[in-house]
A protein has these predicted regions:
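Hydrophobic/basic alpha-helical segments
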Residues: 1-126
Length: 126
């Protein structure tokens, strides 16, 4: 949150606008994303790479684990979601396995079934 405020202030200075100007408008005029949207986009790309075997196999095994369907089922069936357990703690909600699966499941089917990273990036925006 502090870092986002810093980015907003820097954007206003670069754009030569006053502090009263809406930060979302300033970021949009500069073509900047919020830090949160950038994090989500980068996490989505990383998940795509994990699921489609562009990373070390242990990452996919760790993400899919025993709480999930086999990857062959996920990628070849009509259901492209990652199964994940209901979190019992805040710690689990903040884990990459949980938040990543939740993010992946929120993506469009078109994005999840993209044939390349560049197509995936186009499908998730930006």
């Amino acid at each position: 949150d502090k870092l986002q405020k810093f980015q907003n202030r820097a954007a206003r200075i670069i754009a030569g606008l006053s502090y009263e100007t809406n930060s979302a408008d300033v970021l949009e005029s500069l073509g900047w994303e919020t830090l949160e949207s950038r994090r989500q986009r980068m996490k989505s790309v990383f998940l795509y790479k994990i699921i489609n075997d562009y990373t070390a196999p242990n990452l996919k095994q760790s993400l899919m684990g025993s709480n999930s369907m086999p990857s062959s089922y996920i990628l070849r069936s009509t259901d492209t979601d990652i199964a994940f357990p209901k979190p019992r703690t805040e710690f689990l909600k903040k884990s990459f396995k949980y938040s990543g699966a939740k993010l992946w499941n929120s993506l469009s089917r078109e994005a999840k079934e993209a044939q390349s990273i560049s197509i995936f990036k186009q499908n998730i925006g930006r």
